[in-house]
Amino acid sequence: MCIRDRVLGILYELDGEPCPVDPRHVLRRVVSRLADDGLYPVVALELEFYLLDSALADAGEAHPPVLPDTGRPAERTQVYSLADLDGVSSFLAEMESVCAAQRVPLGGASSEYAAGQFEINLEHVGDPIAAADHAILLQRAVKGIARKHGVAATFMAKPYPDSAGNGLHTHVSILDDSGRNIFDDGSEQGSDRLRQAIAGTLALLPESMAIFAPNANSYRRLIPGNYAPLAPNWGYNHRDVSLRIPVSGHKNRRLEHRVAG
């Protein structure tokens, strides 16, 4: 019996210094600087993906699959369809089991805005590095389990020219030393520090696009009518902006970064 495991490593130079191109070190420095100011991010990620016909995917062609549990082609565009979730119920059940074994905190799953498109949400965690690790492990699990169930999976930003793209949505709130959410001041609009965080994030957005949209396909996603951002903007519960402030209770006030894909 072949036993396999995985290790998420951190890169160091031969002299023991952190490797400058390791993104975990970059994120660790950011988290450390926030902690020096008594601030602690709480992060949750949402990942969108398509399930595809595996034979055509192997040939380099994207085409919706036959849903493995119902035998019905994934043809409809019905956001939040329960029937589409029924069609992949065994896939989702195995996802839950595999992620539990890896301590990846799944939150929920939904069918999305195109045929064969789904989203899986991860729970909020107080360690941004762990949140990033969870996303990587989730991607690997989705692709591997999809193959086991006779379909392929892709997180490509825009696999179909005329359908919605896939994004990575990052939800962030920040707590102070007392555990209070600094984005909440009891008002419906949120605190001044929330608006300051929005302003700073938008100011850095042009330079950040090399990471958030790293290839030409990423920009094919950024078109009108697909719940993807078109400008460095923000809004309350608006799904076409770069930074969305979701409807939530005051203590859960957060910023959703919707650009990456």
Task: Say what each PLM segment does.
Residues 4-261:
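Glycine-rich, acidic/polar active-site loops that bind/position phosphate-bearing ligands
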